[in-house]
Swiss-Prot record:
Keywords in alphabetical order: Acetylation, Calvin cycle, Carbon dioxide fixation, Chloroplast, Disulfide bond, Lyase, Magnesium, Metal-binding, Methylation, Monooxygenase, Oxidoreductase, Photorespiration, Photosynthesis, Plastid
Catalytic residue positions: 175, 294
Compartments reported by the entry: Plastid, Chloroplast
Chain positions found as N-acetylproline: 3
N6-carboxylysine modification, residue list: 201
Miscellaneous comment as given in the Swiss-Prot or TrEMBL entry: The basic functional RuBisCO is composed of a large chain homodimer in a 'head-to-tail' conformation. In form I RuBisCO this homodimer is arranged in a barrel-like tetramer with the small subunits forming a tetrameric 'cap' on each end of the 'barrel'.
PANTHER family in UniProt: RIBULOSE BISPHOSPHATE CARBOXYLASE, RIBULOSE BISPHOSPHATE CARBOXYLASE LARGE CHAIN
Subunit structure: Heterohexadecamer of 8 large chains and 8 small chains; disulfide-linked. The disulfide link is formed within the large subunit homodimers.
Gene name of the encoded protein: rbcL
Name the UniProt record assigns to this protein: Ribulose bisphosphate carboxylase large chain
Family per record: Belongs to the RuBisCO large chain family. Type I subfamily.
Propeptide residue range(s): 1-2
Reactions the enzyme catalyzes: 2 (2R)-3-phosphoglycerate + 2 H(+) = D-ribulose 1,5-bisphosphate + CO2 + H2O; D-ribulose 1,5-bisphosphate + O2 = 2-phosphoglycolate + (2R)-3-phosphoglycerate + 2 H(+)
Positions contributing to Mg(2+) binding: 201, 203-204
Length: 477
């Protein structure tokens, strides 16, 4: 036996493979205020006990590997390892369990969503012992929250910048999303803003294509914005999409937007990546720009109930990384979004403190310790008949965004914007007078139609448009 081997043996090293649960399943563990807590939906392979599956998740997302290694003796596993501290069966589902895992804070780099996700949702999602794995929720401890800047400005600062209070903000995505020239694009922006919208928006896949280069689009949109402001006396904005192939190019576009004096830029945070998003959020705070976030690609990650990452986790990650708005679903429109689940993560975006509430899918109490809030954006298949429900569901601190529901108006873009603004003002006034938007919404809209021909025309066009499909991601019974 060599001296090196003797040394390893003398400190208790024993080569081989042992069950994860012997080291990483610790039901007696008392979680600490500084731990990051995770709730995983685990579907083990046949024959794999839930305790072993939960322990495998804790191990493979922290300090463990598939075999014992002698370098374990050079550090303190008890200090750094993840621990599966509770497992509960999912009622109504065969062979599904919620495994709760606690991670010591020292495992993660300060201020880095990228590093946090690389550990927690890294290679473990391809682990053969698991048929499926989904991250349902995270508890981010205040000690870690305080290492993040978060949103560039937040809800109250945005309202102060725009001088708009007491109602949801109104937006519109310019359509068709691809193919317009920069000048025609700017014309559509002007008409929508002149008609009464607060914002217009680049679609998520508008970057810098041959039919419309980014610099031309920025210039024509800025011209439209300033012209609409001069005519209406209101502050207007257009979400200029700064997403690009490199971080350097993205920041260059944001710099040009700042030089034009516009109030807001945009980023596709999942396709662009968390490192790029955090970099842009820091630039926006330093330079007075609001930051609108689109969640393109989210459904690839979050839509399947038994595998992936729930959007409430992606929403928390965005609040940490930085963004002033983020698309959150509509409940009533064309995109996925069950009401209780949606309102659960909307509260996680906006509120300072959110209590655990399993009836809304919230597994952990979350204290954001004064991290600025994010405005949820309802967008996708909505029109004037949805306005009462949207106002009632999302409240004042939200952005209601009508793309086709503005540009599809039979009289044009500006009348479409007028229709939406009138519908919103009618709903807000009715709510403030004590009327029930959920019960009287259609009546409120019909009353407003009597003095707004633009709204009456919109109501006639979309009176039979509904999207009656069951949500895929629903709460456990």
């Amino acid at each position: 036996m060599s001296p090196q081997t003797e040394t390893k043996a003398s400190v208790g090293f024993k080569a081989g493979v042992k069950e994860y649960k012997l080291t990483y399943y610790t039901p007696e563990y008392q979680t600490k205020d500084t731990d990051i807590l995770a709730a995983f939906r685990v579907t083990p392979q046949p024959g794999v006990p839930p305790e072993e599956a939960g322990a495998a998740v804790a191990a493979e997302s922290s300090t463990g590997t598939w075999t014992t290694v002698w370098t374990d003796g050079l550090t303190s596993l008890d200090r750094y390892k993840g621990r599966c501290y509770r497992i509960e069966r999912v009622v109504g589902e065969k062979d599904q369990y919620i495994a709760y895992v606690a991670y010591p804070l020292d495992l993660f780099e300060e201020g880095s969503v990228t590093n946090m996700f690389t550990s927690i949702v890294g290679n473990v999602f391809g682990f053969k012992a698991l048929r499926a794995l989904r991250l349902e929720d995270l508890r981010i401890p205040p000690a870690y929250v305080k290492t993040f800047q978060g949103p560039p400005h937040g809800i109250q600062v945005e309202r102060d910048k725009l001088n708009k209070y007491g109602r949801p903000l109104l937006g519109c995505t310019i359509k068709p999303k691809l193919g317009l020239s920069a000048k025609n694009y700017g014309r559509a922006v002007y008409e929508c803003l002149r008609g009464g919208l607060d914002f217009t928006k680049d679609d998520e896949n508008v970057n810098s294509q041959p039919f419309m280069r980014w610099r031309d689009r920025f210039l024509f949109c800025a011209e439209a914005l300033y012209k609409a402001q001069a005519e209406t006396g209101e502050i207007k904005g257009h979400y200029l999409n700064a997403t690009a192939g490199t971080c350097e190019e993205m920041i260059k576009r944001a710099v040009f937007a700042r030089e034009l004096g516009v109030p807001i830029v945009m980023h596709d945070y999942l396709t662009g990546g968390f490192t790029a998003n955090t970099s842009l959020a820091h630039y926006c705070r330093d330079n007075g720009l609001l930051l609108h976030i689109h969640r393109a690609m989210h459904a690839v990650i979050d839509r399947q109930k038994n595998h992936g990452i729930h959007f409430r986790v992606l929403a928390k990650a965005l609040r940490m990384s930085g963004g002033d708005h983020i698309h959150s679903g509509t409940v009533v429109g064309k995109l996925e979004g069950e009401r209780d689940i949606t309102l659960g993560f909307v509260d996680l975006l906006r509120d300072d403190f959110v209590e655990q509430d399993r009836s809304r899918g919230i597994y952990f109490t979350q204290d954001w310790v004064s991290l600025p809030g994010v405005l949820p954006v309802a967008s996708g298949g909505i029109h004037v008949w949805h306005m009462p429900a949207l106002t009632e569901i999302f409240g004042d601190d939200s952005v209601l965004q009508f793309g086709g529901g503005t540009l599809g108006h039979p009289w044009g873009n500006a009348p479409g914007a007028v229709a939406n603004r009138v519908a919103l003002e009618a709903c807000v006034q009715a709510r403030n007078e004590g009327r029930d938007l959920a019960q009287e919404g259609n009546e409120i809209i019909r009353e407003a139609c009597k003095w707004s021909p633009e709204l009456a025309a919109a109501c006639e066009v979309w009176k039979e448009i509904v999207f009656n499909f069951a949500a895929v991601d629903v709460l456990d019974k």
